[in-house]
Amino acid sequence: MLQNEVENFANLLEKATAYLAPFQEKIIVVKYGGNAMINEDLKKLVMQDILLLNQLGVKVVLVHGGGPEISQGVKLLGKEPQFINGLRVTDQDTINVVLQMLTGKVNKSLVALLKGKGVGLCGIDGNMLQCEKLQAEVDYGFVGEIVKVNTQLLDLALNANLIPVISTVGVDEQGVVCNINADTAASEIAMALGAAKLVSMTDIAGLLRDRFDENTLIPEVEVSEVQELINQGIIAGGMIPKIACCTDFINAGGIEANIIDGRVPHAILVSLFGGKNGTLFYKK
């Protein structure tokens, strides 16, 4: 390297180390979904970034969905996927597809990209995600809400310097398998593990003042401001439960939560190393 290249690299490394310091030997939970999961090139970059963080001493837990794959599997059965208020209606055929696609194909494809450092798990394993049937005005079928997270298997994996890769199905007291929202699962797992940071990868730039204009990105939100943003209609629709997961995590003791744009290459590293990506939620 030329002298100026060495100096530039050293400066970059120094800055990265400073940003990373609060998270070394700490747990970061990444909720993985959206375009970064569908685009094969982005998927490889995400897994490379997670491997790098693991090598730098950050304990990463990857929680993933698999909506497009599940919908594809349902269509192969001759059915149309059904959603109410953004939640998938999960009948017996659909929960079978969830088990095949989410805990099988999707989970193992991610583990394979982690080159021996990933360990594939689902919420049924070790009774990790204990749930009960979601109570709502409509019947969503086999959809659950988490009542307890058992971290035993996660603790074992993290202590062995492995990267848990978790598909979001759970089980109730009767042994009935339920589909669980991935954002909710990631938040609950992060709280149970005492994670320092929660990262949610999405297909949008972050929280926008005008949802049709990415130039109106709100880069930071203090959690006490969230209700007013809801009142103003800035936080609306599907962003309300997603941001609620972030605020629940922070109010439970997490340092910060990010909703980041998964369409951006190396989005996780950018958010960790002080770059501008998505919206950061924090508490004063």
Sequence positions of predicted segments:
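Short, basic/aromatic-enriched C-terminal tail that caps enzymatic domains
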Residues: 267-284
